[in-house]
Amino acid sequence: MAILQSFLLLLSLPFLFTLIYTKKMKESKRNLPPGPAKLPIVGNLHQLQGMVHRCLHELSKKHGPVMHLQLGFVPLVLISSSEAAEEALKTHDIECCTRPNTNAARVFSRNNKNIGLGAYSDEWRELRKVAVREYFSVKKVQSFRYVREEENHLMVKKLRDLALKQSPVDLSKTLFCLAASTVFRPVFGQSFSDNKHFSEEKIEELVFEAQKSLTFKFSDLFPIPGLGWFIGFVSGQHKGLHKVFIEVDNFLNHMIDDHQKQNQPQDRSDIVGSLLDMIHNQEQDKSFKLTIDHLKGITQDIFLAGIDTSAITMIWAMAELVNNPRVMKKVQDEIRSCIGIKKERIEEEDVGKLQYLKLVIKETLRLHPAAPLLLPRETMADIKIQGYDIPRKTLLLVSAWSLGRDPKYWKNPEEFNPERFIDCPVDYKGHSFEFLPFGSGRRFCPGMASAIATIELTLLNLLYFFDWKLPEEMKDMNMEESGDVTIVKKVPLELLPVLYH
């Protein structure tokens, strides 16, 4: 087998060098953005060891806010300034709003039948309309308010018991379970803890394994007929990708089967039930027909992207608050003075009174965007950004992480200081290009309203009912990062809750 692999590699080398030479000749005629020197074949892959968003940030400080790299045979442009981001995501949004055709995108999008990874098309636009109407609209988010309130109440009861025992809490796990619970009931019609097919631990593992599978693989970087497939086959990347996808698909099949066995009447309140009713009752002559694969695509987006991103933001917020006692005291003083000290249960309407809490969340999103490089885009036409040529089929990354730390826009950018947003018009809704935790343009995250509602209410509950401190054996908070598409706190957040009342 090793001899065969070596023989095939030798056969491909002349072809590879011919492609490299041809590509170099074409590039020499274009005004490409600056970037680091590239090695033959691998390009700049050797410079992206470790946390990729940090590697790219350091390179961009040297080469500029519009930077060109080569990953294997795939050209990449990194955007890390507000002006360049506005050109890419607003001026040229229509030319930059598709996704790269990676192995993971093809598999997990079910051939472009979901929103997050699907290519831009008429089908994608129709599917997004359905998803927004059934789950992501402000009206729908408000209709699920009772779920968020009930799940937070259950979380507080469990934390009370632990506080009475003076027992430390793994807040990373607690907040993942809370985020999952607020998704499971509206989407699948059942509690996260009551799932009879998968344990809580298995679902958590599945979410993180799926996120890891969505990263660029070595085989994606050599999109030459046969070569990419060969690399993926020999390395086992294809096998690993399909294994995770099959597990996700099995989970969704179980959820759908449970609904189909219930024989409930129409107008079911959860998303799976509503979409099944739409599939069964849709007009046959419509140009866009919703299918089971579309249903899986929508629910998979919510399941994989909606749980860990909200949990990640809440974890970082609590970590920063414990690290910054001044901010912790100020936000708790606001909460307790506005709400009083005798409330047994927090309601979502209480959030509207709390301006400093909202600033804390903004500052957390600035320093710790859950997806620091957003999701990759691909140019569908030749464009110019900041005067540089960006050819068609170029991978485009926007570093929300770098934008949030740029001293050009933020004073003392590494400091956790919510007051910076007082009387500041900058917001996270996609129109302030120095602050893009949810992206912008046609690929703006549709789950923003749902995520913010969950984050605000959960932090309010944690900060109203409890004081928080490090366990006695811990001297300092470890703030190291870990992850790929999303960036989590490397060491789980363990804190000691102290009952306030």
Swiss-Prot record:
Source taxon at top rank: Eukaryota
EC number from the UniProt entry: 1.14.-.-
Transmembrane segments: 1-21
Enzyme class: oxidoreductase
Keyword Iron tagged: yes
Annotated signal peptide: none
InterPro entries referenced in this protein's UniProt entry, alphabetically: Cyt_P450, Cyt_P450_CS, Cyt_P450_E_grp-I, Cyt_P450_sf, Cytochrome_P450_71
Location(s), subcellular: Membrane
Cellular component terms per the entry's GO annotation: membrane
The UniProt record lists the keyword rRNA-binding: no
Cofactor: heme
Binding site for heme: C445
Keyword annotations of the record: Heme, Iron, Membrane, Metal-binding, Monooxygenase, Oxidoreductase, Transmembrane, Transmembrane helix
Name of one Pfam family that matches: p450
Membrane topology: Single-pass membrane protein
Molecular function in Gene Ontology: heme binding; iron ion binding; monooxygenase activity; oxidoreductase activity, acting on paired donors, with incorporation or reduction of molecular oxygen
Family assignment from sequence similarity: Belongs to the cytochrome P450 family.
Protein name in UniProt: Cytochrome P450 71B25
Organism listed in the record: Arabidopsis thaliana
Primary gene name: CYP71B25
